[in-house]
Amino acid sequence: MQKLWGKVSIGTLWYLSGGFGKSNGADFSNVRITRGYLTLKFKPVPWFQPRVTLDTSQDSSGDWKVRLKYMHAKFVLPVETAWVTEPNVEFGLVHGPWFDYEENINRYRMQGTMFVERNGVINSADTGVTVAMLLGKKLPKAYQQSVSNEYPGEFGSIAFGVYNGGGYHAAENNTNKVFESRVSVRPLGPILPNLQLSYLLIYGKGNTPAQVCDDTGANCYPGEPAWRLNAGMASFEDEYFVATAQVAKGRGNQSGSKIDAAGAALTSEGYSGFAEVRLPWIDSSLVGRYDHWNWAGTGTDRVIAGFAYRFLGEGNVVLLDYDRSMPDGGTDSWEAKLTVQVKVP
């Protein structure tokens, strides 16, 4: 038993923030915990790597609750070839194909959710199965140490899977299964590994029953609205600079809430840009992001700017940022806040 415990690793990830601002015309100020993860990983052998992550969050009444974020068995084929490296399968409550990839390029999930999640399309985990692998051999250690050791395939990486479709916030409300896939390529391979081009596809239905009725049962409309997304991202990572540009177009969303009066899925489209200027000589970064998203002709623009300081390694960060949301025909909302990310190990 003691020998097995030596193969268990424990990690934490916390986002602790305090800020003030204006939301829908009303002033606010608060201190809050936006993420509280406790993760246990078990690696008894290289080919079997199960994981469980508990997520502590605060509900609308202010009560603190613990829920599962991930709980899966992961099977890895520990090989490195000229074609694929470390193909693996996650089964259970698993990573989706996209967000773990994007959040290892834009390292500021502590500020808030990523582009398509921020606009209500999808969240980051679901119950199902994910297949993933690196394309080609791994990039040289020098690149991994100076730029990034995440998804280090010489020619990119792929991930795809089939999921219940409710995410990790909700039970499955229909029998539909959702297909999601990501393809990321380094078009110049190891010649210019900094550049990646990625494509995300989502094909399924929103997480509602086949028929949705009001409380009286008299007014009903068809459920299971279409949920489609096509998104592309170009990214460039360097020791001193990171930039991404995204475009997306689709219909509907994961929860099935983005619909018209007849229950049909709303169309959507948007674009986003992110940049980080790294200042390693003072363990700091300047970050900026711009989002535009449009649901059926109603758009929202968002601007984010911040300064980050890293201490005791790359995982512990203090971020001071300003976030402003500007909806068409509505009242701007904004927040200035300080966030501390604590990551162990």
Regions from the PLM with identified roles:
Residues G21-D27, S61-L68, E102-R107, Y143-S146, ...:
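Outer-membrane beta-barrel translocator domains and adjoining extracellular loop/strand segments
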Residues M1-G165, N173-E180, S184-I191, Y271-R278, ...:
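Outer membrane beta-barrel
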Residues G306-D321:
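C-terminal closing repeat unit and adjoining cap/tail of repeat-based domains
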Residues K41, S235, A308-R310:
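Well-ordered beta-strand positions
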Residues D332-P345:
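Outer-membrane beta-barrel "beta-signal"
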